[in-house]
Amino acid sequence: MSLTIPSPASGTSTSATTDTAPAAAPQRTYQVRTFGCQMNVHDSERMAGMLEDAGYVPASGENADVVVFNTCAVRENADNKLYGNLGMLAPVKAANPGMQIAVGGCLAQKDRETILKKAPWVDAVFGTHNVGALPALLDRARHNNEAQLEILESLDVFPSTLPTKRDSVYSGWVSISVGCNNTCTFCIVPALRGKEKDRRPGDILAEIQALVDDGAIEVTLLGQNVNSYGVEFGDRQAFSKLLRACGEIQGLERVRFTSPHPAAFTDDVIDAMAETPNVMPQLHMPLQSGSDKVLKDMKRSYRSTKFLGILDKVRERIPHAAISTDIIVGFPGETEEDFQATLDVVEKSRFATAFTFQYSKRPGTPAADLPDQLPKAVVQERFERLTALQDRIAAEENARQLGRRVEVMVTAQSGRKSEETHRLSGRSQDQRLVHFSVPEGAEKPRPGDLVTVTITEAAAFHLVADPASAADYSLRRSRAGDAWDRSQADSCGAPVAGGGAGSNGGKGGVSLGMPALPVRRS
């Protein structure tokens, strides 16, 4: 679907012809604002890559010539967040003739014309299947002085073939599939991203190799349901084979993936995780509910016994695995007995982290039409009980890490109190967030380097390592750290000593894997 809709006129100016050649027009700047999941974060990298390929440059501050919103449609507050942001930009655009606003992603795929009706100052709306159209839509909107709406109903080109500006030089997202064949009643994503489409293994491995050649030492394999990878070309063990193939890539030190589905999580994947050294001892396994009745209503096609059995198998093969999950509270028809079943499964599962959500009614999903929608007060009370339980479990599980020696990959992001504590931050192999200090006289690591430290403090959402002396601190400078040095030198226009593989400019803006804190929704 492609529509052209009149938009507010952008100011233009003309100047008298002179004998001197006009100065070159300054490059237009851009900013991409991302809402939602890791898939959206990676899509935003593609949007940035395409804009830079078209001659745009990143905005140095808040003011940009082009602002792109990459949206989420999973929860109601995603709508509110988008339209709130668009409302705040309306006067900014009115005061800056030539500024453009574009909206893409899942909410754009869903709302389509509604976005232009609610925010007629938007210049371009595009969906999940035509991310590559963004630069052309912006150009067309400027040329025609009309808003452009283009939504495709199926994938135009697999997005990983598009230019990409990586947010991190030491870690990278790699899509192995897009879309989903499941029919969970609460989820609108399959309707917006379509049926599952798989990349060929050779294409995936080539992209990973290119990332490693540029200095990355960590990748996260992305898909709506990664362990169903291979369904398009008829190989039920394709995902486990892909994990093992990642283990053959020299220089690739950490492999993660998100997210799998319990119904199709098979023993060959667990074996590949356990037997491939660079596949990290970390698993995100969405539970959603511990009640078999609610799981049936959700059309999740597994039950609590199967879920707990998967965790048992993983921990048997990978004893130190950290397991995280997603849980929805207040699904229509959830009784107190159903909720207690969820609490029981959470207690048994001993999750390192749980991302807990209050059910949000989404038009267009089967669950939105179910009877027995729960009162807000009931959902809130259950949510608070669940988060209190999980916070206790997380603190207990982290306390078990005290005294352990862990290898931490240093990230560009620091903790909120880093200026006070002078600690740096990073992720352990099992994806726990670790804040650590560098002993006096020891060499300071760069983002992408690896340090080995002993855990000295534990809290529910992070660990602390304060080495008593330099003898309790080990630094391994990495190719990823070299890549970070080069990227910083490139951004400053300064030379840097060589080391490691070829350069891939960028900044360390995105931490891979799951967020550090559970998502709190009120």
From Swiss-Prot:
It catalyses: N(6)-dimethylallyladenosine(37) in tRNA + (sulfur carrier)-SH + AH2 + 2 S-adenosyl-L-methionine = 2-methylsulfanyl-N(6)-dimethylallyladenosine(37) in tRNA + (sulfur carrier)-H + 5'-deoxyadenosine + L-methionine + A + S-adenosyl-L-homocysteine + 2 H(+). It is found in: Cytoplasm. One of its GO terms (cellular component) is cytosol. Residues 399-469 form the TRAM domain. NCBIfam families: miaB-methiolase, MiaB/RimO family radical SAM methylthiotransferase. Monomer. Residues 28-143 form the MTTase N-terminal domain. This is tRNA-2-methylthio-N(6)-dimethylallyladenosine synthase. Its EC number is 2.8.4.3. GO terms for molecular function: 4 iron, 4 sulfur cluster binding; metal ion binding; N6-isopentenyladenosine methylthiotransferase activity.
